[in-house]
Amino acid sequence: MIVTGVYDCTTGRNELLQCNTFFKSYNGKSIVVICDDYINSPDYIVSLYLNRGSECVNKISSLFVIISADSTGLHIMCDPYGSQWNLFYCVKDGLFYYSTSMKSLLSVCPINRTLNKNAAKIFLKRGFLIDGQTLITDIKCLTCAQELFFNQDGLHVQHYKYQFKICNYSKSDARNMLIPAIEDSILAYFSKADKSVSLPLSNGYDSNLIFNTIRKKCNDKEINVFTIGGVVGRNEIPAVKENIKGIRGVQHYTDIIDKELLRSFPDIVWRLEGSLFEGGVFLQYALGKLAQKAGITKMICGECSDEHQKSRFIKDMFNVTHGKYHPNYRYYSRANPFLTTHFVVLKKSSLMLNSFGIRGCYPFVNVTFTQLASILVSDNLNCLNLAYVHRRH
């Protein structure tokens, strides 16, 4: 999914050079919505946006990017988690260029391609970049809970205040509500018209919960599961084969990562466009390649489940979305579960799958799940484990 455009503040013209997603024109305003439309439809998001402006974010449950332009200026915003899609942008000669693809942006924007050396140092140390920096000096990237405005007064970027609702359920009620809430989120990602469902399947709780929910609620659909193992380290293929043995209607695709995958390193870098680098990208690359070969265009993934169950997640989300965080780079570490969700875990999966023409669906990146998890979570116990223990007793 690629959206590329250029906005001229002197004429108020927004020219879409590429757009294979939802577009609507309303009273002289053009609006592009890239969203998780299984959860919230683009029309619903546009309606909220037109009525509430930036405050629409507090009523939208899905991941999204909104691009709105009229004669007065351009406004772009993304969801609090930073979206599945990057939004790169730069300003050159009074024109504002933007795209969901770095390669596409570079093909239309006549800027000097200068390496951002400070950003490169951070990237080599952390594996990802923050505060909207990229590896190219003049190109920036919209990050979690951010919005930007561009008009004749120039460019203004800020964090909007996301009002996350804290629920006052008892722990007992939250335990009883957790699994049904996750099941509802999973089931929202496919319709009766879908003949099959596809997902990565490991030996962990999150993917098995997705798998068992689909089996239980949609036993009329074929299930395609994908497991990637490794020659070195943990190989979960045998365990997964044992778990699904004897279950009808399941097609199991597998692949093994070995040293030969290193030959694909240039292709991996090309697909991620300098957004991040982490050891897990090799697994994601193998997964995307295997799923593409099988003709899959949509996968339901368990990413971000662990991060949303960390005791610090809500606090870190509040600090980031309200601008109450220390600007020093050392603050941004893997110990921050909210930023890890945005900069590493979600993007690692979504960007790689998107590069193979596969849409990733993420039922654990869900407001209700986060609300319930925040009640149940503790430093030493994963709340999904807690829910399973509770049900077994």
PLM regions with names:
Residues G73-H75, Q152, H159, F164-H393:
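ATP-dependent adenylate-handling active sites, centered on carboxylate activation for C-N bond formation
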Residues M1-D255, K259, F265:
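Cysteine-centered catalytic environments shared across enzyme families
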